[in-house]
Design a protein with these regions (language model features):
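Active-site phosphate/pyrophosphate-binding segments
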Residues: 38-165
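Glycine-rich phosphate-binding loops that contact phosphosugars or nucleotide phosphates
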Residues: 1-84, 167-198
Length: 199
């Protein structure tokens, strides 16, 4: 709601485009983005509940805005969208219920984290690595890439203190690349752990 990038993007768009409309998704009703567009007939601000983020990473806010964007812009039926929300809620409850198990599995003296995601998971991989970088205050080195791109140089980032997460795509063709890089990194026996994240 107050990021210089968001506000600058709106100002540049207003300058460059003669006929433009804005859809603002924010959880900050007092933010400049919401306030400055309140009386603008070419702007619609959709406020979402605050996610009670306590840190700089804003993981809850990001998750809510990502979900809302999908619900707004995807052409699926309302019934299908409701099913997605229900499935996401169930997955979230399962993760919370298994928090101790997950924490124990991921415990260790790691200093590097890599996220790999292809296709629709490319942006998620980038955001995930950014969140780790922010939450660890830069003390954990992070990287992200696609499954195909990673093997062509960036894989040299992996050492024996690296956790590698691969978001495994549901698309059958893309999934082959994701599973292949999982097996390749696991077979190298260098990374501390290689973890598949999938449904």
């Amino acid at each position: 709601g107050n990021s210089p990038e968001s506000l600058a993007a709106v100002n540049v768009a207003r300058t460059v485009c003669k006929n433009i409309k804005f859809l603002n998704l924010t959880c900050a009703p007092e933010g400049k983005l919401a306030v400055e567009s309140a009386n603008d007939s070419n702007a619609l601000t959709v406020l979402i509940p605050r996610a009670n983020d306590k840190g700089f990473a804003m993981t809850g806010s990001y998750t809510c805005m990502e979900l809302l964007s999908t619900l707004i812009f995807d052409e699926a039926s309302d019934e299908q969208k409701a099913a997605w929300v229900e499935a996401a809620a169930v997955m979230g409850e399962n993760v919370v219920a298994r928090e101790e198990e997950v924490a124990a599995f991921l415990s260790g003296d790691y200093t590097r984290v890599t996220y790999l995601g292809s296709g629709s998971f490319g942006g998620l991989a980038q955001e995930a690595q950014l969140k780790i970088l922010e939450l660890a205050h830069g003390l954990t080195a992070t990287s992200y890439d696609t499954s195909m791109g990673y093997r062509h140089g960036p894989k040299s980032f992996v050492d024996d203190k690296t956790l590698v997460f691969v978001f495994v795509n549901n698309d059958p063709y893309t999934r082959q690349y994701d599973l292949d890089i999982l097996h390749e990194i696991g077979g190298d026996e260098i990374a501390m752990k290689t973890i598949a994240v999938q449904q």
